[in-house]
Amino acid sequence: MKIIHQPADLAIGRGKACLAIGMFDGVHLGHQQVFRQTIEDSHRNEGRSVAVTFDRHPASVIAPDRTPAMLQNRNQRLRAIESLGIDDVLLIEFNTAFSRKPGAEFIRELADGFGMIHSICVGANFTFGHRRDGNVGLLRTLGQALGFHVHGLQAVSLDGQAVSSTRIRAAVRTGDLDAAGQMLGRTFAIEGIVVEGDRHGRELGFPTANLDTNGLALPPNGVYAAHARLGQVTHRAVLNIGLRPTLANPDPSLQVEAHLLDFDADLYGQAMEIELVERLRDEQRFGSTDELATQISRDIERARTLF
């Protein structure tokens, strides 16, 4: 899959670009049907399927105080899109200037840049452009004028409700990871860069990889059995999310740290993806670090029975 930053970077024939447009946070079941339709269009037209998406959530520019916690970081999102068979991604920098662009202007620029579009596929409730002045109706009007087809697909339903990134975030936040996984079509996973911690885990005999998960949706604090993926290699792990109340810290901050079973190496600066297998217990305050170490040993032994 090729990642481009402007339509002209992709040399394809006139009328061969089949576009899916959206933020696609989570690349959930609803997004997946949009991509399937886009890929089907490209195969029928001997064209290219192109996901048009943004480098950051629009709310982070338009209303930073209302930016949602993201289900994926950018690399996760792009990998998920690639896994579905999309040919190319147009990754647009969403900045203040772009946020002020009317929807019709955005679509006309795409059509000009790609040298005419064959089709655009979006969700039925998709909006775009300055002050959300664009919707499926505007796309259909522009499609008639510019010669492209429009698919406005109805949401995928699960248990009688529409699958959406908002609904999945709520499921993650409350710890309903089974529901989140069903809506995502895969196990919920957190990815972050391994950063330097305070080495308390190593002092207890259980070295951990501390992840930078700033801006990501996280499940409730607690201990989880997990799979930790480093590149193409997966390790069994125990994940802790919380404030580590047993450790003396007058100003605790949320930590996301993974102990990889039967593994010990310097991982600083590497990307690690954590798939949550099962919640083991709530976060607890212990009377001593010895009691904490004993409980961690029990957590590890229980986790081993789950893999």
What does each of the following model-derived ranges do?
Residues 60-146:
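N-terminal Rossmann-like or analogous alpha/beta NTP/dinucleotide-binding catalytic cores
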Residues 28, 81, 120, 180, ...:
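Residue-level signal for inorganic ion chemistry
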Residues 9-73:
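N-terminal catalytic cores of NTP/NDP-binding nucleotidyl/phosphoryl-transfer enzymes
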Residues 2-9, 69, 90:
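Short acidic-hydrophobic, aromatic-tinged amphipathic segments that line or gate anion-handling sites
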Residues 13, 197-307:
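Phosphate/ribose-recognition catalytic cores of enzymes acting on nucleotide-derived substrates
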Residues 143-243:
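Glycine-rich, Lys/Arg-enriched anion-binding loops that position phosphate/diphosphate groups
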